[in-house]
Amino acid sequence: MRKNESQRETKETEVSVSVLLDGTGSTTVNTGQPFLDHLVSSLGKHAMFDIDLKASSRDGIVHHLVEDVAITLGGAIDKALGDRSGIMRFGHASVPLDESLSEAVVDLVKRPYHRIEMKIKRPEVEGIAKEDLEHFFDSLLRNLDCCIHLTVKYGNNDHHRVESAIKSLAVALRMAVSADPRREGPPSTKGSM
């Protein structure tokens, strides 16, 4: 069973998360930030990960909460993948949300690189600063320890841009973490990821 339970406790926040990669998309998320809850729930729902995440701020600073949720969640997914043997490794998805379109391309090789183009226009979306939303994706992907290109192609509504981005990432991750029944060991000519 590909599962991980992780905690992160600092003077700024307290975060606990349980992730089951081979789940049904069931999520229970409570961070105190409704849009952050929505993003994490959307990731779980469309990646088919079961996610139970609780987070609280100790200092009242939204940036710290957003960052620590992403760090803990990304790390938990990474740990749940183990040595990444027998997985598809690659995934890609284009996902619309009304007028917005996003694309995610994933390689679960353990070489961290990511490029994110969000194209958020407003200073904040649903009570979270633009730079904190961008930092959420950055921290999540950095701690997932893989290579991901995530691009919002276009859109007029910033909420839709961000939501289509998380959903395209989720669908691409679902593909990449899927078991490959024909593969034994790591999906790499090197013999390890």
Curated annotation (Swiss-Prot):
Pfam families (alphabetical): IGPD
Protein's cellular compartments: Cytoplasm
Primary localization: cytoplasm
EC number: 4.2.1.19
GO cellular component: cytoplasm
Keywords: Amino-acid biosynthesis, Cytoplasm, Histidine biosynthesis, Lyase
Pathway(s) it belongs to: Amino-acid biosynthesis; L-histidine biosynthesis; L-histidine from 5-phospho-alpha-D-ribose 1-diphosphate: step 6/9
InterPro entries the record matches: IGPD_sf, ImidazoleglycerolP_deHydtase, Ribosomal_Su5_D2-typ_SF
Gene Ontology biological process terms in this record: L-histidine biosynthetic process
Classification via SUPFAM superfamilies: Ribosomal protein S5 domain 2-like (SSF54211)
Catalytic activity: D-erythro-1-(imidazol-4-yl)glycerol 3-phosphate = 3-(imidazol-4-yl)-2-oxopropyl phosphate + H2O
GO MF, one annotated term: imidazoleglycerol-phosphate dehydratase activity
HAMAP family (UniProt xref): HisB
Family named by the database record: Belongs to the imidazoleglycerol-phosphate dehydratase family.
Matches recorded under PANTHER family: IMIDAZOLEGLYCEROL-PHOSPHATE DEHYDRATASE (PTHR23133:SF2), IMIDAZOLEGLYCEROL-PHOSPHATE DEHYDRATASE HIS7 (PTHR23133)
Protein name (record): Imidazoleglycerol-phosphate dehydratase
Organism annotation: Cenarchaeum symbiosum (strain A)
